[in-house]
Amino acid sequence: MKFTKIFTGLLLAMMLFVTPAQAQRSQSADDPSGFVVLGEFIPDIIQEIRYYTTYNFVGEKIDGYEMPCALMTIEAAEALKKVSDDVMKMGYRLKIFDAYRPQMGVDHFMRWAANVNDTRMKKYFYPKIAKDRIIPEGYVAVKSGHSRGSTVDLTLFDMKTGKDVDMGGTFDYFGEKSHPDYKKITKTQYKNRMILRNVMIKHGFKPLAEEWWHFTLKDEPYPDTYFTFPVKLLQK
């Protein structure tokens, strides 16, 4: 009887102590019910959804981007709202380039990368990278963390100047210059990168070593699900 009571107590304690990783959920890849529209959830953000336009490394509107809006999981959006509140106090707003990316968009990237003759945007986004090296060097891949819904590409917008903060490099540039710790930039540019990086880390996001603009919620709710629904306003 004593052993039974001890075992029951341990079991109850284990049930009560659930880590974020243990709280991960499974969901159908075509089900957007765990997502929100960032512009509605965080009204202060600015959205410049590059893959809805032709100004991106592919040079054409990307499959799956039906509207120029950003979507994220509820958990990631809640964390990003805290980031937004913090940077607003510093005189900045968040500018979003991309968030949730449907798998069909990733597939579009792969088709483009396989066509080595299409280099129309090379001088803007990958001037120092041969087109046939884009896949081997990992600039695009068959799966993207963006498709799990808790990754965001963003920068800071200075409310005083009315311009993007100078990060010493541009969004989606393929090369060492995009690494957060790249040394051949000014102290001010590096400081700006660190302002963004530190506030994102503070609120539960982890950075990427190759891209200063890229962050993923550390305790993302769907770490194994690559969603397929298109980017558009969600039905309420």
Regions from the PLM with identified roles:
Residues 1-6:
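Positively charged n-region of N-terminal signal peptides that target proteins for export
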Residues 215:
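Conserved metal-phosphate-binding beta-hairpin within the catalytic cores
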Residues 8-18:
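Bacterial N-terminal signal peptides
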Residues 22-99, 106-107, 111-210, 220-236:
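Extracytoplasmic cell-surface/polysaccharide-interacting catalytic and binding patches
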